[in-house]
Amino acid sequence: MKRHSILIAALVAGTMCQAQTFETKYARPLGDVLNDVAKRFNVKLKFNVDTTGLKLNYADFRVRPYSLEETFDNILKPFDFYALKQNGNLYKIKQYEYPRRQPVDGQKLIPYLASKYSDKASWEARRDTLRKEVRERLGIDALLARCSDEKPLVGKTRKYDGYTVQNFCMKTVDGHTVKGSVYTPLAKGKHPLIICPNGHFLNGRYGKVQQQRLGTLARMGAICVDFDLWGWGESEDEVGAKAHQTAEAHQMQALNGIRILDWMIKRKDVDKSRVGVNGGSGGGTQTVLLTALDDRYTAANPVVSLSSWFDGGCPCESGMPIQLSGGGTCNAEIAAMFAPKPMMLVSDGGDWTSTTPELEYPYLQRIYGFYGKTENISNVHLPKERHDFGPNKRNAVYDFFIKTFKLDASKLDESKVTIETEDQLRFYPKKK
């Protein structure tokens, strides 16, 4: 019995030694390696990836006993994984995200980009290159060339306190449509126009926060238009929810924004000298992209979105490689293409806009300075707030457009806005 036990132990030891040799590349299961790392560095791991069946070559040699970060880097990069620090000693193991980087990357990228231009002339040469390449990489011109020129269908007008709401359905390309709503002041005369792409907030354009903002801006004197994200709302009925997580969504949302402006700017009650764009989160990403694609905008207000180290986590924001334009760019540089026209950034301390006051905003001030118009770029930073479109952020939006478009501040009262149901805001009834 004793000899039998010794033999088994010897066989096990031999197998282990055989497994951990040069010939086997010292390979170990990735899950086992990560468990050992967690014990060594006294951390907890949460997995957003499947490590089943994955083996890591030269596994133990990748560990750096003096650095958890370097160890993670060495172990996870071969699989396109990375470790994201959470609270305390918890780390989340995630799939590599090409649009998401770290603040330190922005701190390196912004000076690099800034070194490419020292005055208005060199900046405009760079700007023109970016503008051309962004259009090409997005593929927007081929889509625009195929667009329908049919007049949009409009629904009945619903009258509220100081404004009206009317739904529309517009044919775009390849038989697709975009649906949305127009919020119009009751007052007669010429009004500024604000295109309002929405982000990934609760209930999309049907949500209370979205309606509060557009209704309030309309009461103060601006015509506001929003529309469904590709694959959300009525667009989901047409193309399915999965279509939102595609590169096509990036193209179609930009196309929809351009075509809606084409239609709205022809209205007799629209003042073409006051055309704005405003959205939050993914809607803020759309806001910046639309300013790069369409020079008819005269004011822009991206909210909780603009960053030099995050391109937008949804394929509808980063599905086409526009950030590779000009040898590599970012949303901050794309936003700079709007200079010297008025732009306000709304940022907070709880998301990727946390670096705006010391990184992206000074960078944009420099670009605006080339035109002697630093007063046209501003930043409202809310360091204690997180990623949302809360009242302080909405108030910043109101203040910006009151100042820029001369809206009637005496009408600023969100309580006067009627919150409609999704069915009321849809052009066609929701399928049961």
Task: Say what each PLM segment does.
Residues 160, 175-178, 185-194, 200:
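Proline/glycine-enriched tight loop/beta-turn segments at coil->beta junctions
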Residues 279-291:
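Glycine-rich nucleophile elbow surrounding the catalytic serine of serine-hydrolase chemistry
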Residues 189-269, 305-316:
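Cap/lid segment of the alpha/beta-hydrolase catalytic domain
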Residues 1-23:
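Bacterial Sec-dependent N-terminal signal peptides
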Residues 269-281:
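Alpha/beta-hydrolase fold nucleophile elbow
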Residues 65, 96-177, 347-432:
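Alpha/beta-hydrolase-fold serine-hydrolase catalytic core, especially in secreted/extracellular enzymes
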Residues 297-336, 341, 348-361, 370-373:
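Mobile cap/lid helix-loop segments that gate and shape the active-site cleft of serine hydrolases
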